[in-house]
Amino acid sequence: NVVMDRAFPVIRDRILENNTPVVDSVTAATFSSYGVKAAVADAMAQAGLEVEDITMTTAGPEKEAKTLEDVTADIVVVGGGPSGLAAAITAKQTKEDVNVIVVEKMDILSGNGKFDMNFYDLINSEAQKAAGNEQWTVNQVENFIEAKSSAGDSPERVKVWAEQENVLDAWLRDMGVNLDYNYGAMNHMAKEDQYAGEVIQAGMEECARDLGIDIRTGTKGLDLIMEDGRCTGVTVENNDNESYGIKAQYTIIATGGFCSSKELLGEYAP
């Protein structure tokens, strides 16, 4: 299970460390956390031990607020989904000794990306070649760009997307992410019965950790640090109610959530 595989180690450790199932749920895995906590509480009750009823809102005691010393990095990425991990991995692959920190407010990475069934509109992929599908010509790519361009998706963005898809496919394959099931012309899954998002996220997470990227889950960005009109990092707060600053030469915002902002939608996609 794409959620439970990530959530179980976190909720297990919390229960063992506190010697009780009355602990905070894993953010982004509320139902999975509830199932584990309820099962532990039931086992304790059957053993004759006292434990309070477990509900969907059961949480551990509130932690005292603390302010920690600031840390430094070359690059800090806010958001641990596919785009944030892609930025962090690319930075590390480009310059091996660069110090990269990724902060993600949820306890597990990816957000909704891990639930994506398809990788849409992948052009001239290895899976298409293996299936014997005719490779797109320059004219076909240009027609695709024209058809996909709209007020909400500029021709410039679509052009980069269309012309670099095969490069992206090769990049993913280099980290063991093989989208080998091609159907419906440009739709791709890992296998016929395996979603693309699950495999992409797992491969990117493994690659990021192998590269030595500092990934801090349960850590939300609070505000940008601005000095003389320039962003020099971000202030964060973790699940232990500890806040601190991450000072960095470069700050990358990859939090998503654009469609939840009425103001941004009104300005850029009316």
Where in the sequence are the language-model features?
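Active-site- and interface-proximal helix/loop "cap" or "latch" segments in soluble metabolic
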Residues: 1-58
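A conserved short coil-to-beta-strand element within the FAD-binding core of flavoproteins
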Residues: 217-231
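N-terminal Rossmann-like FAD-binding beta1-loop-alpha1 element of flavoenzymes
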Residues: 70-102
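A short, basic/flexible loop-to-alpha-helix module at the beginning of a structural domain
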Residues: 54-72
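Conserved N-terminal/central alpha/beta ligand/cofactor-binding core
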Residues: 99, 105-214, 263-270
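Glycine-rich, acidic and aromatic/proline-enriched surface loops and short helix-turn segments
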Residues: 13, 174-177, 253-260
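Glycine-rich loop(s) and the adjacent beta-strand/alpha-helix scaffold that form part
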Residues: 241, 249-270
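Core beta-strand elements of the Rossmann-like FAD/NAD(P) dinucleotide-binding domain
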Residues: 70-73, 240-250
